[in-house]
Design a protein with these regions (language model features):
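Short, flexible beta-strand-to-coil junctions
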Residues: 69-74, 125-126
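Acidic-basic catalytic patches of nuclease active cores, encompassing PD-(D/E)XK
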Residues: 1-59, 70
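Conserved catalytic cores of phosphodiester-cleaving nucleases, focusing on short active-site segments
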Residues: 66-68, 77-86, 105
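Short, solvent-exposed secondary-structure capping/transition elements
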Residues: 75-78, 114-115
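Beta-rich catalytic cores
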Residues: 62
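Catalytic cores of nucleic-acid endonucleases
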Residues: 86-127
Length: 127
C-alpha cells in the first residue's frame, strides 16, 4: 500500500537562498490559470521561475513553476510541480521542453535536499 503524502513547508523554508522566492501556492496556481483557494492558505512554494529570473538578466534556463515540500511522516522531500492550466491542446506540449524544465530545476536544487521521485505535471480538463 502506498504511503499517504501531505504538503509541508519545512523543507522549502530551511533553504535561505530561496526565501525571497517563497510564495503562497494558491497565488501561484491562480497566476497560472488555476482556481483560487484550491489549497490550504498556509501552503507555500518556491516560485522557481521567479528565482531563475532573479538570478540573472537576459536568457533564463527553463524551470518548473513550483517546488513544494511533501512528507510521508518519515522524511520531507522537495516535489517539482509544473502547472499547465492555460493549455487548450495537448499538441502544443513539447515533451523535450518539459524534460528540459525538469533537468534545469533538478540542477538548481542539487544539494538542497531529497527530491521526490515523481514530478507533477498539472493540466486542465481539456488537455
Amino acid at each position: 500500500m502506498a504511503e499517504l503524502m501531505t504538503w509541508t513547508n519545512e523543507p522549502i523554508e530551511r533553504l535561505p537562498q530561496f526565501s525571497p522566492y517563497l510564495t503562497n501556492f494558491n497565488g501561484l496556481v491562480k497566476r497560472e490559470g488555476g482556481p483560487a483557494n484550491a489549497f490550504p492558505d498556509a501552503m507555500r512554494c518556491i516560485d522557481l521561475d521567479a528565482y531563475e529570473k532573479g538570478l540573472k538578466k537576459g536568457i533564463h534556463n527553463p524551470t518548473v513553476d513550483a517546488v513544494i515540500g511533501v512528507s510521508s511522516g518519515k522524511s520531507a522531500e522537495l516535489a517539482l510541480i509544473e502547472l499547465r492550466l492555460n493549455y487548450k491542446n495537448a499538441d502544443n506540449l513539447s515533451p523535450t521542453k518539459l524534460e528540459e524544465k525538469v533537468s534545469c530545476s533538478k540542477d538548481i536544487l542539487s544539494g538542497c535536499g531529497k527530491l521526490h521521485l515523481i514530478v507533477y505535471f498539472v493540466f486542465n480538463k481539456q488537455v
